[in-house]
């Protein structure tokens, strides 16, 4: 019985970016996020309760090798949060990213309509910063719409989930 539980709790069956290799429409993240994109999202705690909502304005500039992405989040409690990403394309399927509140480098993987972004973010909580690991997926729906789902963990335990809809101008 213990072996069964350990096997079923492992991450071997987790969704992988390569699972979307031959699917359409293809999400080329530097193309989709270039220009203006509007977003709306909800943050849920580990129990699934919606704790915050936001709208966001994104503006990206692609120079042929690197995407500079400016994000401005307007939270429903009045907080305004900004972030600037520098996302570098390594090859057709691999990316690296940095931002002021990201620990080290983010790793990105692009296949078909899916883009997976893995990173550790410094999140302000009660006057201090916590390191939260993000497993961030974006799925392109058509030329204008993409859906984002991010799972946030601390010490391997889920602490929150984020659901976002993007609409490109």
Which ranges hold each PLM region?
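Amphipathic/hydrophobic helical signal segments and adjacent flexible N-terminal regions
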Residues: 1-49, 61, 169
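Short structured motifs
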Residues: 21-25, 55-56, 101-105, 133-135
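Central antiparallel beta-sheet cores of small beta-barrel/beta-sandwich binding domains
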Residues: 40, 44-125
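Amphipathic hydrophobic-ligand
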Residues: 50-56, 129-134, 158-162
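Exposed beta-sheet edge/beta-hairpin loop segments within beta-rich domains
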Residues: 124-128, 136-139
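Glycine-rich, aromatic-bearing surface loops/beta-hairpins
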Residues: 135-136, 140-169
């Amino acid at each position: 019985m213990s072996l069964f539980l350990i096997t079923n709790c492992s991450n071997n069956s987790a969704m992988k970016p390569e699972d979307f290799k031959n699917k359409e429409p293809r999400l080329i993240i530097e193309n989709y996020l270039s220009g203006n994109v509007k977003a709306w999202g909800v943050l849920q705690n580990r129990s699934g309760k919606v704790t915050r909502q936001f709208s966001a304005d994104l503006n990206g500039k692609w120079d042929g090798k690197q995407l500079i992405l400016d994000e401005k989040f307007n939270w429903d409690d009045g907080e305004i949060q900004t972030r600037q990403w520098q996302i570098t394309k390594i090859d057709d399927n691999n990316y690296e990213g940095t931002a002021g509140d990201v620990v080290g480098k983010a790793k990105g993987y692009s296949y078909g309509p899916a883009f997976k972004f893995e990173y550790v973010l410094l999140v302000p909580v009660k006057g201090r910063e916590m390191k939260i690991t993000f497993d961030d997926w974006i799925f392109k729906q058509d030329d204008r719409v993409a859906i984002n789902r991010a799972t946030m963990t601390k010490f391997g335990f889920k602490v929150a989930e984020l659901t976002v809809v993007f609409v490109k101008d």
